[in-house]
UniProtKB/Swiss-Prot annotation:
Residues 1-281 are annotated as: Interaction with HTZ1. Participates in the catalytic exchange of histone H2A for the H2A variant HTZ1, an euchromatin-specific factor, leading to chromatin remodeling and changes in transcription of targeted genes. Indirectly involved in vacuolar protein sorting. The modification Phosphoserine is found at S425. This is Vacuolar protein sorting-associated protein 72. The keyword Thylakoid does not apply. It comes from Saccharomyces cerevisiae (strain ATCC 204508 / S288c) (Baker's yeast). Residues 40-179, 314-406, 462-510, 554-585 are annotated as: Disordered. Keywords: Chromatin regulator, Coiled coil, Nucleus, Phosphoprotein.
């Protein structure tokens, strides 16, 4: 209670500023203006409604046009803002009054009433002063409202009435005329444009486009005009159409001719281009062509191929050797010459005895049985291998006490002696007769000076030669060569009869009408092969005059060159009489051909082979010595053909046997339980160290490029085991992985050996790592590591 009494005493005793302050001149003006404006708006709306009803719109429009103001009137906008601010302040004041507490004192309420009454008195005085201004503003507001309404309605459109056309006149059609954009209008000075560089650039581009479009438009219009003129022309007659057709035909022919010429020109160019692309070499350019092909070879083809190339090499060697060396004499030939000297002495003594006893012999016994036989292949081979023991085959029923010796003459030796020793001027009769030797073993030799026997022998030989010539053309060639190279048979002395026949032949008797020519035909097949090797070949004949088996001893005192040719003839005879057949399956082999020729098809020049192969400087540098050659020249390679070892008698056989020892291990036919055992010896060397220098494989890296960690050493992996795929870092880790993979060891099953009782001797044999499994996995423990202190055994 004391507080309320104190407040009342303060209110009565104190004086407030609001009571003592003088009143403002414009107090309450804003609220009054708002009220008046609201009244004016209501009145204006009523007038507009009445005016619309009465139809006074035209007059009001004319008044509005007279008092039309600009839309951007800054003064009016400022006044409108002030009015809005006053309205907002009034609303704020009314809201503040409502929020005041109802328990205000009666004195404060009385003061407020006094303040409001004073404001009303001041406002009445000010209204009289501003009456004229308010009237002006009211009129302005009215004019603006009218103008806004007119704008909202839009302008009034008045349509013009069209004159009605008369009944007789035609109604003209209306054509819409479009104004074409002209490029020149863009460059007019009166046109308002910007002076910016970008704007000027764009205008120039538009100007160019419009100018081009205008040119095209003119061209199109000109075409349309011509087309319309053509349509408007009169119809053509038949003569005019024929004339136009002829003209068009000429034009078409010319165009077709031109088209043909173009096609021919294109074809020629295309062919020339293809030819230029194909022709990679210049004319007369040396080309070395390599060709590898598949080839089916048989053993016979291999032998023929080897024989052909052997002959080619022999020909080349003969061309290279200007002065061929004579081959060395064999010791066997020397011994044979010594034996021949002894035989020659015995023959001379026998001949002397035969001259004395020949008169008392009966020559008619010679004519009892006469026969000419051709020796078989086995007899000829034996006669060639052992000429001192050549025995003629005669039946025992035909033997008689009188006998004549077997006469054998070596024609090839005589023929080659004429080539090697006898000059062209020397007669060949003496050479032939000196080489012929007649011997007898165990029987006396009679003198053959009777003319009848000699004529019969010559006729037999001539008939046999004729049959051989008629048998085959190859034999005719050989016989002609023999006849040209050897002289006709003649007597060198009064006592000796000389007959020219082939080697290893026996004269047995008169010729029969039918002669066997098997051996001759066999010899004729080998004639081309022997001509390739540049050796003379003669056919074999054997003639005998005896009834008893005789032995013909051949004395060949010849030079070493003759003996070599004789050996070649013997080998060829062996080949012809007993040919060895080689059989075998065909083998697919590869054959490489190297061809050197001049482009396009000129034959190669074999003389300048090295020049074509190594260049033009080859001949120049080849003629110079090693000191005169330029320093920048280097030897590329040495081409040397190894010479095969030359044997005295070339063997026709070739060893083609294969090593089939590997087939012994396989089971043969009928063996089902045989097993192949491979023996593998392994040696362990612990002193060597493994040094890995290869690059790490891709399996060492993860997907992000980081190396994997080694499971043993926890280092970065360098390699991984290809068998298991386990990565490792070094060799020690790899060894540990190998030990873990070893499942069996000598000491694995022994439980009596404790961990501490292991020694160094058996440490290698024991298991170092042992697997200890758990519920969800396990671990390999190193048994060699000592556990920590206090760990129980077996933990």
């Amino acid at each position: 209670m004391s507080d309320e009494g104190a407040d009342k005493s303060l209110d009565t005793n104190t004086e407030f500023i609001i009571q003592t302050r003088s009143r403002r001149s414009n107090a309450g003006n804003k609220l009054q203006k708002l009220l008046e404006q609201e009244l004016r708006d209501i009145e204006s709306t009523k007038r507009q409604i009445s005016s619309y009803k009465n139809g006074n719109d035209d007059e009001e429009d004319e008044i509005g046009l007279l008092f039309q103001e600009d839309e951007d009137d800054e003064d009016f906008e400022m006044m409108a803002k002030d009015d809005d601010d006053e309205g907002e302040e009034k609303e704020d004041e009314t809201q503040s009054i409502r929020k005041e507490p109802s328990q205000a004192s009666s004195e404060q309420a009385a003061d407020d009433l006094m303040f409001s009454s004073s404001e009303s008195e001041d406002s009445s005085n000010e209204n009289d002063e501003d009456a004229e201004e308010k009237e002006i503003r009211r009129q302005e507001l009215l004019s603006r409202k009218k103008r806004n309404k007119r704008l909202q309605k839009g302008p009034v459109v008045i349509k013009k009435q069209k004159p009605k056309p008369k009944s007789g006149e035609a109604i003209p059609r209306s054509h819409h005329t479009h104004e074409q954009l002209n490029a020149e209008t863009l460059l007019l000075n009166t046109r308002r444009t910007s002076k910016r560089s970008s704007v000027m650039e764009n205008t120039m581009k538009v100007y160019e486009k419009l100018s081009k479009a205008e040119k095209k438009r003119k061209i199109i219009q000109e075409r349309i005009r011509k087309h319309k003129e053509q349509e408007s022309q009169h119809m053509l007659t038949q003569e005019e159409r024929l004339r136009i057709a002829k003209e068009t035909e000429k034009l078409n022919i010319l165009s077709l001719d031109k088209f043909k010429e173009q096609e021919v020109w294109k074809k020629e160019n295309r062919l020339a281009l293809q030819k230029r692309q194909k022709q990679k070499f210049q004319p007369n350019e040396t080309i070395l062509q390599f060709l590898s092909t598949a080839w089916l070879m048989t053993p016979a083809m291999e032998l023929e191929d080897r024989k052909y190339w052997q002959e080619q090499l022999n020909k080349r060697d003969k061309k290279k050797k200007k002065y061929p060396r004579k081959p060395k004499k064999n010791l066997n030939l020397g011994k044979q010459d010594a034996s021949d000297d002894k035989k020659r002495e015995s023959e001379e003594s026998i001949k002397n005895d035969g001259d004395v006893n020949s008169l008392g012999e009966n020559s008619s016994s010679v004519h009892n049985q006469k026969r000419i036989e051709e020796t078989s292949t086995n007899d000829t081979v034996e006669g060639e291998s052992s000429p001192d023991a050549a025995v003629s085959r005669v039946n025992s029923d035909e033997l008689k006490p009188t006998a004549l010796p077997d006469v054998t003459l070596d024609a090839i030796a005589n023929k080659q002696s004429t080539v090697d020793e006898a000059p062209n001027s020397q007669p060949q009769k003496n050479i032939i007769t000196n080489e012929q030797k007649i011997t007898n073993v165990g029987e006396p030799i009679q003198n053959l000076h009777n003319e009848e026997i000699k004529d019969e022998m010559v006729s037999a030989l001539e008939s046999r030669e004729n049959t051989f010539e008629n048998s085959s053309p190859a034999a005719q060639v050989v016989s002609q060569r023999d006849n040209s190279a050897t002289p006709t048979p003649s007597n060198s002395t009064g006592t000796e009869d000389t007959i020219l026949i082939s080697p290893d032949t026996d004269i047995k008797g008169e010729p029969e009408p039918c002669l066997k020519t098997e051996g001759i035909e066999n010899l004729s097949h080998n004639v081309p092969q022997e001509t390739k090797s540049n050796t003379d070949v003669s056919f074999l004949k054997q003639v005998t005059f005896t009834d008893h088996p005789q032995v013909a001893i051949i004395d060949t005192e010849e030079s070493p060159s003759k003996k070599d040719t004789a050996n070649v003839d013997e080998s060829s005879a062996e080949n012809s009489l007993s040919t060895q057949t080689y059989e075998g399956p065909e083998q697919l082999t590869s054959r490489n051909f190297v061809t050197l020729y001049d482009f396009p098809n000129a034959p190669p020049n074999l003389k300048d082979f090295n020049t074509n192969l190594f260049g033009d400087r080859w001949s120049y540098t080849n003629g110079l010595s090693a000191t005169q050659r330029p320093q920048d020249m280097k030897t590329v390679f040495h081409s040397i053909l190894p010479s095969p070892p030359q044997s005295s008698v070339p063997s026709p056989t070739v060893d083609i046997s294969l090593d089939l020892s590997a087939l012994a291990n396989f089971p043969s036919f009928g063996e089902y339980d045989k097993k192949i055992v491979h023996q593998i010896n392994t040696e362990i060397n612990k002193d060597l160290e493994i040094k890995i220098k290869t690059q790490p494989p891709t399996g060492v890296f993860l997907a992000n490029g980081i190396r994997k960690k080694c499971l043993i050493t926890n280092k970065e992996c360098q390699y991984f085991d290809p068998r298991t795929g386990v990565p490792y870092s070094d060799v020690e880790a790899y060894k540990i992985i190998q030990r873990i993979q070893d499942p069996i060891s000598k000491e694995e099953g022994r439980s009596d050996i404790k961990r501490d009782e292991t020694t160094n001797e058996d440490s290698d044999d024991q298991v170092r790592f042992k697997w200890f499994g758990f519920k969800n996995g396990g671990i390999y423990l190193d048994l060699s590591q000592r556990p920590a202190k206090g760990v129980p055994e077996g933990f």
